[in-house]
């Protein structure tokens, strides 16, 4: 069975150029500069003995940054003084020194907790019996209306229980809906 060629043979002309000097005009020498870390092409005259007499081009220079001018105010200590103070205060041999001036509590404001825990009232037949009307948060009927209003939502859950406006004022509408229902002779169902 004869072997078949799968592709054309590569031509010898597309080879990369050899890295060593050739005898034509100028020699191309590739080397890597340590500081610039990039591949450079150096042209040398034909017959140069070695790379020892190579002079680095003038455009490749190490960066030089001018010293930063001092912009701090006269009263600000320098970073050296700050670092020395920090090092002396954080040395391992001595314990940390207490603050120079302890914080004094202000006497004008009484000490109160920032967050008060929520109070839970268990559901009962009269949820607002011991609460003054200013803290009830219930909807008040407009002046001239004689109907019993439904208070705002209570922690109790369950079905709505509404009574007509003719019964005792101790009965209340227990509901979870918000905002309070519109005024009328009875609560909406």
Curated annotation (Swiss-Prot):
Signal peptide: none annotated. Belongs to the deltaretrovirus Rex protein family. This is Protein Rex. A motif (Nuclear localization signal, and RNA-binding (RxRE)) lies at residues 2-18. It comes from the Viruses. A motif (Nuclear export signal) lies at residues 82-93. Keywords: Host cytoplasm, Host nucleus, Host-virus interaction, mRNA transport, Phosphoprotein, RNA-binding, Transport. The modification Phosphothreonine is found at residue 174. One of its GO terms (molecular function) is RNA binding. Induction: Down-regulated by P30II. The RNA-binding motif binds to the RxRE, a complex secondary structure consisting of four stem loops and a long stretch of stem structure, present in incompletely spliced viral pre-mRNAs. This region also contains the NLS which mediates nuclear localization. These overlapping functions prevent Rex bound to RxRE from undesirable return to the nucleus. When Rex binds the RxRE, the NLS becomes masked while the NES remains accessible. The leucine-rich NES mediates binding to human XPO1. Rex escorts unspliced gag-pro-pol and singly spliced env mRNAs out of the nucleus of infected cells. These mRNAs carry a recognition sequence called Rex responsive element (RxRE or XRE) located at the 3' region of the long terminal repeat (LTR). This function is essential since most HTLV proteins are translated from unspliced or partially spliced pre-mRNAs that cannot exit the nucleus by the pathway used by fully processed cellular mRNAs. Rex itself is translated from a fully spliced mRNA that probably readily exits the nucleus. Homomultimer. Multimeric assembly is essential for activity and involves XPO1. Binds to human XPO1 and KPNB1. Interacts (via N-terminal nuclear localization signal) with human NPM1. Residues 1-16 have a biased composition (Basic residues). Residues 1-26, 87-189 are annotated as: Disordered.
